[in-house]
Amino acid sequence: MTKRKSALSALKPTKKQVISSEDSDPEVVVVTNPPLDSPDAEESFISITEEDEAVRQLSTFDFSAKNTKVVRDETRGRSRVFHGMKFKETIVLRGAYVVTVWSGVIHINGALVNINSPVDIPVFAPASHALPQIEAAAGAPETRESGDEDVMEALHQLEGSSVIVEIAAMPRRSENPLITVSNFGKMSSGNIVPFVRQLWHCSEDDGSNYSRIYNTASVVTKSQAAVIPGIYDEWAEVCDDIRRLKHSSTMVVGSQNTGKSTFCKYLSAFMTTKKTGTSVAFVDLDPSNCEFTAPGQVSVTVIGAGHLSPYSILGPSFTHVTAPTYSRFVGYNNPKDDTRGYIEACKAVIDFAKGLKLPLVFNTCGWVRAAGHDLLRQLIDHVKPSDVVFTRDPGVDADQARLAESVKARSHVLDAPDAEPPRFTGAEQHSLQTVTYLHGGNLASHLSDLPALEVGLESVYVGILDSEGVDLADVALSTNSTLLAVMTMDKKTVKHAEITPDGLQYLPNFDIPQGECLGQAMVQFAGASVRLHTPVSASLLNAQLAADKAIVLVRGRIPLPVYELWDSRKGGEQAYVSFDVNSGVGSEAWVARRGLKRK
Protein backbone atom coordinates (compact mmCIF):
# COMPACT_ATOMS: atom_id res chain seq x y z
CA MET A 1 0.00 0.00 0.00
CA THR A 2 1.29 3.42 -0.90
CA LYS A 3 1.41 5.83 2.02
CA ARG A 4 -0.20 9.21 1.55
CA LYS A 5 1.64 12.45 2.12
CA SER A 6 1.32 13.78 5.65
CA ALA A 7 -0.16 17.11 4.53
CA LEU A 8 -0.99 19.26 1.50
CA SER A 9 0.98 22.40 2.30
CA ALA A 10 0.86 25.45 4.54
CA LEU A 11 -1.84 27.82 3.31
CA LYS A 12 -0.80 31.25 2.22
CA PRO A 13 -2.65 33.97 4.17
CA THR A 14 -2.60 36.55 1.39
CA LYS A 15 -5.99 35.90 -0.19
CA LYS A 16 -9.10 33.83 0.16
CA GLN A 17 -9.34 30.93 -2.24
CA VAL A 18 -10.82 27.49 -2.77
CA ILE A 19 -7.98 24.98 -2.83
CA SER A 20 -8.40 21.75 -4.74
CA SER A 21 -6.38 19.58 -7.08
CA GLU A 22 -6.69 17.87 -10.41
CA ASP A 23 -8.04 14.34 -10.41
CA SER A 24 -4.54 13.14 -11.27
CA ASP A 25 -3.30 13.91 -7.75
CA PRO A 26 -5.31 11.57 -5.48
CA GLU A 27 -2.62 11.28 -2.80
CA VAL A 28 -3.00 14.84 -1.50
CA VAL A 29 -4.70 15.21 1.87
CA VAL A 30 -5.72 18.14 4.01
CA VAL A 31 -3.55 20.86 5.49
CA THR A 32 -0.71 21.50 7.90
CA ASN A 33 -0.79 23.74 10.90
CA PRO A 34 0.55 27.27 10.50
CA PRO A 35 3.79 28.33 12.22
CA LEU A 36 3.41 29.33 15.86
CA ASP A 37 4.14 32.97 15.04
CA SER A 38 1.60 33.01 12.21
CA PRO A 39 -1.73 34.83 12.64
CA ASP A 40 -3.37 31.49 11.92
CA ALA A 41 -1.87 29.90 15.04
CA GLU A 42 -4.72 31.39 17.07
CA GLU A 43 -7.23 29.03 15.52
CA SER A 44 -6.24 26.42 12.98
CA PHE A 45 -7.74 23.23 11.64
CA ILE A 46 -7.35 19.48 11.28
CA SER A 47 -4.03 17.72 10.74
CA ILE A 48 -3.77 14.25 9.32
CA THR A 49 -1.16 11.76 10.47
CA GLU A 50 0.31 9.10 8.24
CA GLU A 51 -2.10 6.31 7.53
CA ASP A 52 -1.86 2.95 9.23
CA GLU A 53 -4.19 0.02 9.64
CA ALA A 54 -5.86 1.55 12.73
CA VAL A 55 -6.95 4.58 10.71
CA ARG A 56 -8.43 2.27 8.11
CA GLN A 57 -10.40 0.43 10.78
CA LEU A 58 -11.73 3.45 12.64
CA SER A 59 -11.78 6.26 10.06
CA THR A 60 -13.09 4.80 6.82
CA PHE A 61 -13.23 8.25 5.20
CA ASP A 62 -10.40 8.48 2.65
CA PHE A 63 -9.00 12.02 2.89
CA SER A 64 -8.20 13.25 -0.64
CA ALA A 65 -8.47 16.32 -2.84
CA LYS A 66 -11.67 14.94 -4.35
CA ASN A 67 -13.59 14.88 -1.08
CA THR A 68 -11.84 17.63 0.91
CA LYS A 69 -11.96 21.33 0.06
CA VAL A 70 -10.21 24.13 1.92
CA VAL A 71 -11.43 27.74 1.91
CA ARG A 72 -9.23 30.57 3.13
CA ASP A 73 -11.41 32.92 5.21
CA GLU A 74 -9.73 36.25 6.00
CA THR A 75 -12.66 37.50 8.10
CA ARG A 76 -12.26 34.62 10.56
CA GLY A 77 -8.48 34.60 10.31
CA ARG A 78 -8.29 30.90 9.52
CA SER A 79 -8.92 28.30 6.87
CA ARG A 80 -12.12 26.28 6.70
CA VAL A 81 -12.09 22.60 5.79
CA PHE A 82 -15.09 20.85 4.19
CA HIS A 83 -15.40 17.08 3.73
CA GLY A 84 -17.76 15.24 1.40
CA MET A 85 -18.61 11.87 2.98
CA LYS A 86 -20.25 8.81 1.44
CA PHE A 87 -23.06 6.95 3.20
CA LYS A 88 -21.74 5.01 6.23
CA GLU A 89 -18.25 6.51 6.01
CA THR A 90 -16.74 7.41 9.37
CA ILE A 91 -14.20 9.88 10.75
CA VAL A 92 -12.59 9.40 14.16
CA LEU A 93 -10.56 12.32 15.52
CA ARG A 94 -8.67 12.83 18.73
CA GLY A 95 -8.65 16.30 20.25
CA ALA A 96 -11.31 18.98 20.56
CA TYR A 97 -13.13 20.35 17.54
CA VAL A 98 -16.40 21.82 16.27
CA VAL A 99 -18.62 20.32 13.58
CA THR A 100 -21.12 21.96 11.21
CA VAL A 101 -23.29 19.95 8.82
CA TRP A 102 -23.79 21.73 5.49
CA SER A 103 -25.68 18.95 3.72
CA GLY A 104 -27.15 15.61 4.73
CA VAL A 105 -27.14 13.97 8.16
CA ILE A 106 -24.45 12.64 10.50
CA HIS A 107 -24.54 10.78 13.80
CA ILE A 108 -22.20 11.53 16.73
CA ASN A 109 -22.63 9.67 20.03
CA GLY A 110 -26.21 8.87 19.09
CA ALA A 111 -27.09 12.48 18.26
CA LEU A 112 -28.57 13.19 14.84
CA VAL A 113 -27.04 16.32 13.29
CA ASN A 114 -28.39 17.95 10.12
CA ILE A 115 -28.66 21.39 8.49
CA ASN A 116 -31.32 22.42 11.04
CA SER A 117 -28.95 21.70 13.93
CA PRO A 118 -26.78 24.49 15.37
CA VAL A 119 -23.48 25.42 13.73
CA ASP A 120 -20.15 24.75 15.45
CA ILE A 121 -21.30 21.83 17.58
CA PRO A 122 -18.48 21.10 20.07
CA VAL A 123 -17.00 17.60 20.25
CA PHE A 124 -14.45 16.78 22.97
CA ALA A 125 -12.37 13.66 22.31
CA PRO A 126 -9.60 13.50 24.94
CA ALA A 127 -7.23 10.63 25.54
CA SER A 128 -8.98 9.73 28.79
CA HIS A 129 -12.18 8.44 27.16
CA ALA A 130 -13.45 6.52 24.14
CA LEU A 131 -13.35 8.61 20.97
CA PRO A 132 -16.58 9.74 19.26
CA GLN A 133 -17.14 8.59 15.70
CA ILE A 134 -18.66 10.85 13.03
CA GLU A 135 -20.78 8.69 10.74
CA ALA A 136 -22.53 9.73 7.53
CA ALA A 137 -26.20 8.76 7.63
CA ALA A 138 -29.07 8.68 5.17
CA GLY A 139 -30.98 11.94 5.00
CA ALA A 140 -32.48 14.69 2.89
CA PRO A 141 -30.04 16.33 0.42
CA GLU A 142 -30.84 19.95 1.38
CA THR A 143 -27.85 22.29 1.73
CA ARG A 144 -27.34 24.96 4.37
CA GLU A 145 -27.14 28.41 2.78
CA SER A 146 -24.15 30.75 3.13
CA GLY A 147 -23.54 34.32 2.01
CA ASP A 148 -19.90 33.45 1.32
CA GLU A 149 -19.43 32.74 -2.39
CA ASP A 150 -16.26 30.75 -1.85
CA VAL A 151 -17.98 28.51 0.69
CA MET A 152 -20.85 27.90 -1.73
CA GLU A 153 -18.32 27.10 -4.46
CA ALA A 154 -16.64 24.53 -2.18
CA LEU A 155 -20.03 22.99 -1.42
CA HIS A 156 -20.79 22.87 -5.14
CA GLN A 157 -17.54 20.98 -5.78
CA LEU A 158 -18.60 18.39 -3.17
CA GLU A 159 -22.04 17.81 -4.68
CA GLY A 160 -22.89 14.14 -4.94
CA SER A 161 -21.66 13.39 -1.42
CA SER A 162 -24.17 11.95 1.05
CA VAL A 163 -22.95 14.43 3.66
CA ILE A 164 -20.92 17.64 3.58
CA VAL A 165 -19.44 18.48 6.95
CA GLU A 166 -17.11 21.25 8.13
CA ILE A 167 -14.68 20.37 10.92
CA ALA A 168 -12.64 23.05 12.67
CA ALA A 169 -10.44 23.21 15.75
CA MET A 170 -11.97 24.14 19.08
CA PRO A 171 -11.49 27.89 19.57
CA ARG A 172 -9.41 28.97 22.57
CA ARG A 173 -12.19 31.31 23.63
CA SER A 174 -15.78 31.23 22.47
CA GLU A 175 -19.20 32.74 23.16
CA ASN A 176 -20.86 29.64 21.73
CA PRO A 177 -23.53 28.64 24.32
CA LEU A 178 -23.02 24.98 23.44
CA ILE A 179 -19.40 25.13 24.65
CA THR A 180 -19.67 24.90 28.44
CA VAL A 181 -15.88 25.08 28.77
CA SER A 182 -15.40 28.84 28.63
CA ASN A 183 -11.65 28.90 27.99
CA PHE A 184 -10.49 25.73 26.31
CA GLY A 185 -7.01 27.05 25.63
CA LYS A 186 -6.26 27.34 29.35
CA MET A 187 -8.10 24.16 30.20
CA SER A 188 -5.84 22.15 27.91
CA SER A 189 -2.63 23.69 29.22
CA GLY A 190 -2.37 22.05 32.61
CA ASN A 191 -2.62 25.58 34.02
CA ILE A 192 -4.42 24.36 37.15
CA VAL A 193 -4.70 20.56 36.93
CA PRO A 194 -1.21 19.19 36.23
CA PHE A 195 -2.18 15.96 34.50
CA VAL A 196 -4.54 17.50 31.90
CA ARG A 197 -1.53 18.22 29.68
CA GLN A 198 -1.85 14.59 28.65
CA LEU A 199 -5.50 14.87 27.63
CA TRP A 200 -5.24 16.51 24.22
CA HIS A 201 -1.93 15.29 22.79
CA CYS A 202 -2.21 14.32 19.15
CA SER A 203 0.40 11.62 19.69
CA GLU A 204 2.34 10.20 22.57
CA ASP A 205 5.48 12.19 21.75
CA ASP A 206 4.28 15.64 20.69
CA GLY A 207 3.48 17.03 24.13
CA SER A 208 6.24 19.62 23.78
CA ASN A 209 4.32 21.40 21.03
CA TYR A 210 1.75 23.21 23.13
CA SER A 211 -0.06 24.95 20.27
CA ARG A 212 -0.85 21.69 18.53
CA ILE A 213 -2.58 20.35 21.63
CA TYR A 214 -5.46 22.78 21.51
CA ASN A 215 -5.29 23.90 17.88
CA THR A 216 -5.51 20.52 16.20
CA ALA A 217 -7.45 17.33 16.18
CA SER A 218 -5.74 14.35 14.61
CA VAL A 219 -6.88 11.16 13.01
CA VAL A 220 -6.41 8.44 15.61
CA THR A 221 -3.34 6.22 15.64
CA LYS A 222 -2.99 2.61 16.57
CA SER A 223 -2.67 3.40 20.28
CA GLN A 224 -6.18 4.90 20.51
CA ALA A 225 -8.57 2.08 19.64
CA ALA A 226 -11.53 2.79 21.95
CA VAL A 227 -14.38 4.26 19.90
CA ILE A 228 -18.01 5.25 20.49
CA PRO A 229 -19.77 4.50 17.18
CA GLY A 230 -21.80 7.32 15.67
CA ILE A 231 -24.80 5.05 15.40
CA TYR A 232 -24.04 1.67 16.97
CA ASP A 233 -26.53 -0.78 15.41
CA GLU A 234 -27.22 -2.78 18.57
CA TRP A 235 -27.55 0.34 20.71
CA ALA A 236 -29.66 2.14 18.09
CA GLU A 237 -32.11 -0.75 17.98
CA VAL A 238 -32.61 -0.62 21.74
CA CYS A 239 -32.83 3.19 21.73
CA ASP A 240 -35.45 3.17 18.98
CA ASP A 241 -37.46 0.56 20.86
CA ILE A 242 -37.40 2.71 24.00
CA ARG A 243 -38.16 5.92 22.11
CA ARG A 244 -41.42 4.51 20.77
CA LEU A 245 -42.87 4.26 24.29
CA LYS A 246 -44.89 7.35 25.17
CA HIS A 247 -43.69 7.58 28.79
CA SER A 248 -40.51 5.52 28.90
CA SER A 249 -38.51 5.07 32.08
CA THR A 250 -35.16 3.39 31.48
CA MET A 251 -32.64 2.22 34.09
CA VAL A 252 -29.12 1.38 32.93
CA VAL A 253 -27.42 -1.17 35.19
CA GLY A 254 -23.91 -2.60 35.10
CA SER A 255 -20.55 -2.71 36.81
CA GLN A 256 -17.92 0.02 36.47
CA ASN A 257 -16.30 0.75 33.09
CA THR A 258 -18.92 -1.14 31.06
CA GLY A 259 -20.35 1.91 29.27
CA LYS A 260 -23.34 2.82 31.48
CA SER A 261 -22.93 6.59 31.38
CA THR A 262 -21.91 6.47 27.73
CA PHE A 263 -25.11 4.64 26.85
CA CYS A 264 -27.22 7.01 28.99
CA LYS A 265 -25.84 10.01 27.07
CA TYR A 266 -26.22 8.09 23.82
CA LEU A 267 -29.88 7.31 24.59
CA SER A 268 -30.60 10.90 25.72
CA ALA A 269 -29.05 12.36 22.55
CA PHE A 270 -30.84 9.81 20.36
CA MET A 271 -34.27 10.57 21.85
CA THR A 272 -33.95 14.36 21.86
CA THR A 273 -32.52 14.77 18.35
CA LYS A 274 -34.57 12.13 16.56
CA LYS A 275 -37.72 14.23 16.99
CA THR A 276 -37.67 18.03 17.34
CA GLY A 277 -39.10 19.37 20.60
CA THR A 278 -38.41 16.24 22.65
CA SER A 279 -36.95 16.48 26.17
CA VAL A 280 -35.75 13.79 28.56
CA ALA A 281 -34.81 13.83 32.23
CA PHE A 282 -31.33 12.42 32.85
CA VAL A 283 -31.37 11.02 36.40
CA ASP A 284 -27.83 10.48 37.64
CA LEU A 285 -27.70 8.08 40.60
CA ASP A 286 -23.93 7.54 40.49
CA PRO A 287 -22.27 9.85 43.08
CA SER A 288 -18.80 8.70 42.08
CA ASN A 289 -18.88 9.48 38.35
CA CYS A 290 -21.35 12.35 38.16
CA GLU A 291 -22.27 13.45 34.66
CA PHE A 292 -23.23 17.09 35.28
CA THR A 293 -22.27 17.91 38.87
CA ALA A 294 -19.32 17.67 41.21
CA PRO A 295 -18.80 14.22 42.79
CA GLY A 296 -20.93 13.30 45.80
CA GLN A 297 -24.34 14.28 44.39
CA VAL A 298 -27.30 12.57 42.75
CA SER A 299 -29.28 14.75 40.38
CA VAL A 300 -31.87 15.32 37.66
CA THR A 301 -30.92 17.28 34.53
CA VAL A 302 -33.43 18.00 31.77
CA ILE A 303 -31.97 17.65 28.27
CA GLY A 304 -33.75 18.88 25.16
CA ALA A 305 -36.14 21.60 24.03
CA GLY A 306 -35.65 24.78 26.06
CA HIS A 307 -33.17 23.12 28.42
CA LEU A 308 -29.62 21.76 28.17
CA SER A 309 -28.89 21.16 24.49
CA PRO A 310 -28.16 17.53 23.54
CA TYR A 311 -25.45 18.96 21.28
CA SER A 312 -23.51 20.20 24.31
CA ILE A 313 -22.94 16.74 25.83
CA LEU A 314 -20.80 15.19 23.06
CA GLY A 315 -17.82 14.66 25.34
CA PRO A 316 -16.77 13.40 28.79
CA SER A 317 -18.55 14.66 31.88
CA PHE A 318 -15.92 17.26 32.80
CA THR A 319 -16.57 19.09 29.50
CA HIS A 320 -20.25 19.80 30.25
CA VAL A 321 -20.54 20.42 33.99
CA THR A 322 -23.74 22.40 34.49
CA ALA A 323 -26.36 23.29 37.10
CA PRO A 324 -28.83 20.39 37.36
CA THR A 325 -32.59 20.81 37.52
CA TYR A 326 -32.62 19.26 41.00
CA SER A 327 -29.99 17.62 43.18
CA ARG A 328 -29.39 16.00 46.57
CA PHE A 329 -26.07 15.67 48.38
CA VAL A 330 -24.86 12.19 49.29
CA GLY A 331 -21.54 13.29 50.75
CA TYR A 332 -19.54 10.26 49.64
CA ASN A 333 -18.13 9.00 46.36
CA ASN A 334 -19.15 5.45 47.19
CA PRO A 335 -22.68 4.39 48.25
CA LYS A 336 -21.05 1.73 50.46
CA ASP A 337 -20.02 4.47 52.89
CA ASP A 338 -23.63 5.37 53.75
CA THR A 339 -26.19 3.19 52.00
CA ARG A 340 -29.11 4.57 53.99
CA GLY A 341 -28.26 8.16 53.14
CA TYR A 342 -27.68 7.20 49.51
CA ILE A 343 -31.07 5.49 49.20
CA GLU A 344 -32.87 8.47 50.78
CA ALA A 345 -31.18 10.93 48.44
CA CYS A 346 -31.93 8.76 45.40
CA LYS A 347 -35.59 8.39 46.32
CA ALA A 348 -35.97 12.17 46.64
CA VAL A 349 -34.38 12.70 43.21
CA ILE A 350 -36.45 9.91 41.63
CA ASP A 351 -39.70 11.37 42.99
CA PHE A 352 -38.79 14.80 41.64
CA ALA A 353 -37.96 13.33 38.22
CA LYS A 354 -41.26 11.46 38.04
CA GLY A 355 -43.10 14.73 38.64
CA LEU A 356 -41.59 16.22 35.47
CA LYS A 357 -43.74 13.90 33.29
CA LEU A 358 -40.88 13.37 30.84
CA PRO A 359 -39.14 10.26 29.49
CA LEU A 360 -36.63 9.24 32.16
CA VAL A 361 -33.09 7.88 31.76
CA PHE A 362 -31.47 6.56 34.96
CA ASN A 363 -27.73 6.06 35.29
CA THR A 364 -26.97 3.83 38.28
CA CYS A 365 -23.79 3.26 40.28
CA GLY A 366 -21.42 0.41 39.45
CA TRP A 367 -21.99 -1.53 42.67
CA VAL A 368 -23.86 -4.64 41.47
CA ARG A 369 -22.65 -7.47 43.70
CA ALA A 370 -23.64 -8.61 47.20
CA ALA A 371 -25.20 -5.67 49.07
CA GLY A 372 -25.05 -3.64 45.87
CA HIS A 373 -27.48 -6.09 44.28
CA ASP A 374 -30.00 -5.46 47.08
CA LEU A 375 -29.48 -1.70 46.78
CA LEU A 376 -30.20 -1.80 43.04
CA ARG A 377 -33.29 -3.88 43.72
CA GLN A 378 -34.60 -1.18 46.08
CA LEU A 379 -34.02 1.52 43.46
CA ILE A 380 -35.72 -0.52 40.73
CA ASP A 381 -38.72 -1.13 42.99
CA HIS A 382 -39.00 2.62 43.63
CA VAL A 383 -38.59 3.63 39.98
CA LYS A 384 -40.76 0.87 38.45
CA PRO A 385 -39.06 1.33 35.06
CA SER A 386 -40.48 0.36 31.70
CA ASP A 387 -37.04 -0.86 30.57
CA VAL A 388 -33.87 -2.08 32.27
CA VAL A 389 -30.69 -2.08 30.18
CA PHE A 390 -27.86 -4.29 31.42
CA THR A 391 -24.33 -3.57 30.19
CA ARG A 392 -22.61 -6.92 29.94
CA ASP A 393 -19.72 -7.83 32.23
CA PRO A 394 -18.69 -11.51 32.28
CA GLY A 395 -17.73 -11.21 35.93
CA VAL A 396 -21.25 -10.30 37.09
CA ASP A 397 -23.46 -11.95 34.46
CA ALA A 398 -24.94 -14.31 37.06
CA ASP A 399 -25.91 -11.40 39.34
CA GLN A 400 -27.43 -9.51 36.41
CA ALA A 401 -29.37 -12.60 35.33
CA ARG A 402 -30.93 -12.91 38.79
CA LEU A 403 -31.84 -9.23 38.75
CA ALA A 404 -33.29 -9.44 35.22
CA GLU A 405 -35.50 -12.36 36.23
CA SER A 406 -36.93 -10.43 39.17
CA VAL A 407 -37.81 -7.11 37.48
CA LYS A 408 -41.19 -6.46 35.92
CA ALA A 409 -39.84 -4.54 32.94
CA ARG A 410 -38.48 -5.15 29.48
CA SER A 411 -34.85 -6.23 29.76
CA HIS A 412 -32.08 -5.49 27.27
CA VAL A 413 -28.51 -6.80 27.47
CA LEU A 414 -25.85 -4.81 25.61
CA ASP A 415 -22.23 -5.48 24.82
CA ALA A 416 -20.09 -2.40 25.40
CA PRO A 417 -17.89 -1.27 22.49
CA ASP A 418 -14.28 -2.38 22.76
CA ALA A 419 -12.31 -0.06 25.01
CA GLU A 420 -8.81 0.30 26.33
CA PRO A 421 -8.13 0.46 30.09
CA PRO A 422 -8.79 3.95 31.52
CA ARG A 423 -5.86 6.30 31.02
CA PHE A 424 -6.51 8.07 34.33
CA THR A 425 -7.35 6.64 37.73
CA GLY A 426 -10.75 7.13 39.30
CA ALA A 427 -9.22 9.62 41.75
CA GLU A 428 -7.78 11.68 38.88
CA GLN A 429 -11.12 11.76 37.09
CA HIS A 430 -12.86 12.83 40.32
CA SER A 431 -10.30 15.62 40.71
CA LEU A 432 -10.80 16.82 37.15
CA GLN A 433 -14.57 16.86 37.59
CA THR A 434 -14.32 18.72 40.91
CA VAL A 435 -11.87 21.34 39.66
CA THR A 436 -13.81 21.97 36.44
CA TYR A 437 -16.96 22.41 38.51
CA LEU A 438 -15.44 24.85 41.01
CA HIS A 439 -13.95 26.95 38.20
CA GLY A 440 -17.23 27.08 36.31
CA GLY A 441 -15.51 25.46 33.33
CA ASN A 442 -12.86 28.20 33.13
CA LEU A 443 -9.34 27.19 34.14
CA ALA A 444 -7.74 30.45 33.05
CA SER A 445 -7.15 31.51 36.68
CA HIS A 446 -6.37 29.82 39.95
CA LEU A 447 -9.40 29.35 42.18
CA SER A 448 -8.06 31.83 44.73
CA ASP A 449 -8.00 34.52 42.01
CA LEU A 450 -11.64 34.01 41.00
CA PRO A 451 -14.32 36.15 42.68
CA ALA A 452 -15.89 34.54 45.74
CA LEU A 453 -19.26 35.02 47.42
CA GLU A 454 -19.20 36.46 50.92
CA VAL A 455 -22.04 35.66 53.31
CA GLY A 456 -22.52 36.74 56.91
CA LEU A 457 -22.19 33.98 59.51
CA GLU A 458 -25.69 34.76 60.75
CA SER A 459 -27.12 33.65 57.39
CA VAL A 460 -25.59 30.17 57.21
CA TYR A 461 -25.51 26.97 59.23
CA VAL A 462 -22.79 24.32 59.21
CA GLY A 463 -23.18 20.55 59.42
CA ILE A 464 -20.72 17.66 59.23
CA LEU A 465 -21.86 14.18 58.19
CA ASP A 466 -21.12 11.52 60.82
CA SER A 467 -19.85 14.19 63.18
CA GLU A 468 -20.30 12.37 66.50
CA GLY A 469 -17.53 13.39 68.88
CA VAL A 470 -16.58 16.64 67.12
CA ASP A 471 -15.97 19.34 69.71
CA LEU A 472 -17.61 22.72 69.13
CA ALA A 473 -14.22 24.40 69.24
CA ASP A 474 -13.02 22.22 66.33
CA VAL A 475 -15.90 22.83 63.91
CA ALA A 476 -14.22 25.74 62.10
CA LEU A 477 -10.95 23.80 61.90
CA SER A 478 -12.79 20.77 60.49
CA THR A 479 -14.58 22.69 57.75
CA ASN A 480 -12.26 25.55 56.79
CA SER A 481 -10.57 25.08 53.39
CA THR A 482 -12.66 22.00 52.59
CA LEU A 483 -15.36 21.17 50.06
CA LEU A 484 -18.86 21.68 51.45
CA ALA A 485 -22.28 21.22 49.89
CA VAL A 486 -24.43 24.34 49.68
CA MET A 487 -27.92 23.21 50.66
CA THR A 488 -31.27 24.85 51.23
CA MET A 489 -33.56 23.51 53.96
CA ASP A 490 -36.68 24.34 55.87
CA LYS A 491 -35.85 26.48 58.88
CA LYS A 492 -37.52 24.06 61.26
CA THR A 493 -34.69 21.59 60.57
CA VAL A 494 -32.07 23.97 62.02
CA LYS A 495 -33.72 24.95 65.30
CA HIS A 496 -31.29 22.85 67.32
CA ALA A 497 -28.22 24.74 66.07
CA GLU A 498 -25.47 25.54 68.59
CA ILE A 499 -23.05 28.48 68.47
CA THR A 500 -19.35 27.61 68.31
CA PRO A 501 -16.58 29.77 69.84
CA ASP A 502 -15.93 31.06 66.30
CA GLY A 503 -19.52 32.24 65.93
CA LEU A 504 -20.66 29.46 63.58
CA GLN A 505 -24.22 28.13 63.77
CA TYR A 506 -23.47 24.43 64.03
CA LEU A 507 -25.87 21.50 63.60
CA PRO A 508 -24.46 18.71 65.83
CA ASN A 509 -24.78 15.02 64.98
CA PHE A 510 -25.75 15.87 61.43
CA ASP A 511 -27.28 12.83 59.76
CA ILE A 512 -28.92 12.75 56.31
CA PRO A 513 -29.33 16.09 54.51
CA GLN A 514 -33.06 16.64 53.93
CA GLY A 515 -32.92 19.47 51.44
CA GLU A 516 -32.00 20.45 47.91
CA CYS A 517 -28.32 20.74 47.04
CA LEU A 518 -27.61 23.96 45.16
CA GLY A 519 -24.00 23.01 44.51
CA GLN A 520 -20.67 22.76 46.31
CA ALA A 521 -18.14 25.32 47.50
CA MET A 522 -14.66 25.59 48.90
CA VAL A 523 -15.13 27.46 52.15
CA GLN A 524 -12.99 29.96 54.01
CA PHE A 525 -14.12 31.51 57.27
CA ALA A 526 -13.01 35.10 57.68
CA GLY A 527 -14.12 36.93 60.81
CA ALA A 528 -17.86 37.54 60.79
CA SER A 529 -18.36 36.16 57.29
CA VAL A 530 -17.80 33.04 55.24
CA ARG A 531 -16.24 33.12 51.79
CA LEU A 532 -17.57 30.65 49.20
CA HIS A 533 -15.61 29.74 46.08
CA THR A 534 -18.46 28.28 44.06
CA PRO A 535 -20.29 28.55 40.72
CA VAL A 536 -23.54 28.94 42.67
CA SER A 537 -24.79 32.47 41.99
CA ALA A 538 -25.39 35.15 44.60
CA SER A 539 -28.87 35.72 43.18
CA LEU A 540 -29.80 32.09 43.83
CA LEU A 541 -28.63 32.27 47.45
CA ASN A 542 -30.43 35.58 47.98
CA ALA A 543 -33.62 34.09 46.55
CA GLN A 544 -33.44 31.23 49.05
CA LEU A 545 -32.91 33.65 51.94
CA ALA A 546 -35.80 35.80 50.72
CA ALA A 547 -38.00 32.69 50.73
CA ASP A 548 -37.10 32.22 54.42
CA LYS A 549 -35.03 29.12 53.72
CA ALA A 550 -31.96 28.13 55.72
CA ILE A 551 -28.62 27.90 53.88
CA VAL A 552 -26.71 24.93 55.30
CA LEU A 553 -23.08 24.14 54.46
CA VAL A 554 -22.54 20.40 54.80
CA ARG A 555 -19.21 18.64 54.86
CA GLY A 556 -19.11 15.08 53.58
CA ARG A 557 -16.05 13.11 52.52
CA ILE A 558 -15.43 14.56 49.07
CA PRO A 559 -11.67 15.19 48.66
CA LEU A 560 -10.41 18.55 47.42
CA PRO A 561 -7.24 18.48 45.26
CA VAL A 562 -4.40 20.22 47.06
CA TYR A 563 -3.53 22.34 44.00
CA GLU A 564 -6.83 24.16 44.54
CA LEU A 565 -5.44 25.38 47.87
CA TRP A 566 -1.96 26.32 46.73
CA ASP A 567 -0.92 28.44 43.76
CA SER A 568 2.68 27.44 43.07
CA ARG A 569 3.27 30.63 41.05
CA LYS A 570 2.82 32.87 44.09
CA GLY A 571 4.71 31.33 46.98
CA GLY A 572 4.76 32.88 50.43
CA GLU A 573 1.59 33.56 52.40
CA GLN A 574 -1.59 32.51 50.59
CA ALA A 575 -5.26 32.41 51.47
CA TYR A 576 -5.33 28.69 52.27
CA VAL A 577 -1.67 27.84 52.95
CA SER A 578 0.98 29.24 55.29
CA PHE A 579 4.74 28.69 55.13
CA ASP A 580 6.96 28.35 58.17
CA VAL A 581 10.69 28.31 57.46
CA ASN A 582 13.10 27.29 60.20
CA SER A 583 16.87 26.98 60.06
CA GLY A 584 18.58 23.88 58.77
CA VAL A 585 18.44 21.78 55.64
CA GLY A 586 15.03 20.27 54.94
CA SER A 587 13.28 22.32 57.60
CA GLU A 588 10.86 24.09 55.25
CA ALA A 589 7.30 22.87 55.60
CA TRP A 590 3.97 24.13 54.35
CA VAL A 591 0.84 23.79 56.41
CA ALA A 592 -2.68 23.79 54.98
CA ARG A 593 -4.97 25.82 57.18
CA ARG A 594 -7.31 22.94 57.63
CA GLY A 595 -4.66 21.85 60.16
CA LEU A 596 -3.02 19.00 58.25
CA LYS A 597 0.79 19.19 58.23
CA ARG A 598 2.72 18.13 55.18
CA LYS A 599 6.52 17.96 55.02
UniProtKB/Swiss-Prot annotation:
GO terms for cellular component: nucleolus; nucleus. The keyword Oxidoreductase does not apply. One of its GO terms (biological process) is rRNA processing. It is found in: Nucleus, Nucleolus. Its EC number is 2.7.1.-. Gene3D superfamilies: P-loop containing nucleotide triphosphate hydrolases. ATP binds at G254, S255, Q256, N257, T258, G259, K260, S261. It comes from the Eukaryota. Its main location: nucleus. Residues 1-24 are annotated as: Disordered. Keywords: ATP-binding, Kinase, Nucleotide-binding, Nucleus, rRNA processing, Transferase. GO terms for molecular function: ATP binding; polynucleotide 5'-hydroxyl-kinase activity. Belongs to the Clp1 family. NOL9/GRC3 subfamily. Polynucleotide 5'-kinase involved in rRNA processing. This is Polynucleotide 5'-hydroxyl-kinase GRC3.
